[in-house]
């Protein structure tokens, strides 16, 4: 077989018997690395971020229906970052629920 070499075009400097394999790229054809989630180095960063994202605001479940619409709206309006409200169990509400369950059992007897 005859060895053909291209002198112009995409396959220049490549042998016709060897197909182009992009995963075996040369440094001249390699695009610069793009890292969208890379944090800037300290020397690049002018202002240190106070918040580490994602930001979660913990809100007690006992107040979720009573105050969520008014107080949470004010809290999120004054909070300088995008945040998610995460509900958590109050230690006080568990005692109240246990107490109410005991009362219900007494009433049923």
From Swiss-Prot:
Region (Ripply homology domain): 53-88
GO biological process: embryonic pattern specification; negative regulation of transcription by RNA polymerase II; somite rostral/caudal axis specification; somitogenesis
Record keywords: Developmental protein, Nucleus
Compartments it resides in: Nucleus
Comment, domains: The ripply homology domain is required for transcriptional repression.
Function in brief: Plays a role in somitogenesis. Required for somite segregation and establishment of rostrocaudal polarity in somites.
Protein's name in the database: Protein ripply2
